[in-house]
Amino acid sequence: MILIDGKSLSKDLKERLVTQVQEYKHHTAITPKLVAIIVGNDPASKTYVDSKEKACAQVGIDSQVITLPEHTTESELLELIDQLNNDSSVHAILVQLPLPAHINKNNVIYSIKPEKDVDGFHPTNVGRLQLRDKKCLESCTPKGIMTMLREYGIKTEGAYAVVVGASNVVGKPVSQLLLNAKATVTTCHRFTTDLKSHTTKADILIVAVGKPNFITADMVKEGAVVIDVGINHVDGKIVGDVDFAAVKDKVAAITPVPGGVGPMTITELLYNTFQCAQELNR
């Protein structure tokens, strides 16, 4: 069994990016810059953004965090985003989710300039993903999953891939990326009947449902590759959506939780920020 070590791979990829960013800054005198916006005082949001800010510093990317009070109106937030859209020194914009209930998430996502949409959530980038447009900014977690498969030499062409979970953030975009990579893809969701009949056929199984230890050994094919996107808190520990202890001896390769997909998400955010800077300054 191969352990797909996202933490180690993430470290290697960041080291590669350091060199690329240094060369870019030397040739253009431009420093890529990410601006992250938090609305309210959600502790988890602050933790996520702090880790992103730290990662930016590690690779030579500038970052700025703008924290707005909980009572910020939607129009005030949209006005700020408009200012950042028109600021040539800002290359990437991230609005940390969730937002307070009085702010329409879609209105906010749609207001970000597609070329600065570092999360890849804007409809333009969703469409570009479908069309395999090279200018597409891909969502960070799905992009990280595909990078893991590629870096570990896991063949997608002709493989049967099953994605459990159909969210806009992970399930749908990773299904499209797998399709773009010439896999045959089935996307399962809460209305899928007889889930096991699908998962036991998968050469590549990707799980993102937010249910601890949801995928058990009897649901996985011998020799499959399993990517666990889940992050669940159980009895003071972080566990995935896959019963790792039961599944690991049956599969060819598997990601751990923690230390699997999570670190890759932040690393791909850095790569997307760099891509934004390059595209905006061509």
Curated annotation (Swiss-Prot):
Pathway assignment: One-carbon metabolism; tetrahydrofolate interconversion
Pfam families: THF_DHG_CYH, THF_DHG_CYH_C
This protein's record includes keyword Oxidoreductase: yes
Statement: the UniProt record of this protein carries the keyword Manganese: no
Parts of the chain that traverse the membrane: none
Reaction(s) catalysed by this chain's protein: (6R)-5,10-methylene-5,6,7,8-tetrahydrofolate + NADP(+) = (6R)-5,10-methenyltetrahydrofolate + NADPH; (6R)-5,10-methenyltetrahydrofolate + H2O = (6R)-10-formyltetrahydrofolate + H(+)
Domain of life: Bacteria
A single BP term in Gene Ontology: tetrahydrofolate interconversion
Residues involved in NADP(+) binding: 165-167, 231
Gene Ontology MF terms: methenyltetrahydrofolate cyclohydrolase activity; methylenetetrahydrofolate dehydrogenase (NADP+) activity
NCBIfam families: PRK10792.1, PRK14180.1, PRK14186.1
Family per record: Belongs to the tetrahydrofolate dehydrogenase/cyclohydrolase family.
Quaternary structure and partners: Homodimer.
Role description: Catalyzes the oxidation of 5,10-methylenetetrahydrofolate to 5,10-methenyltetrahydrofolate and then the hydrolysis of 5,10-methenyltetrahydrofolate to 10-formyltetrahydrofolate.
Protein name listed in UniProt: Bifunctional protein FolD
Biological source species: Francisella tularensis subsp. mediasiatica (strain FSC147)
Gene: folD
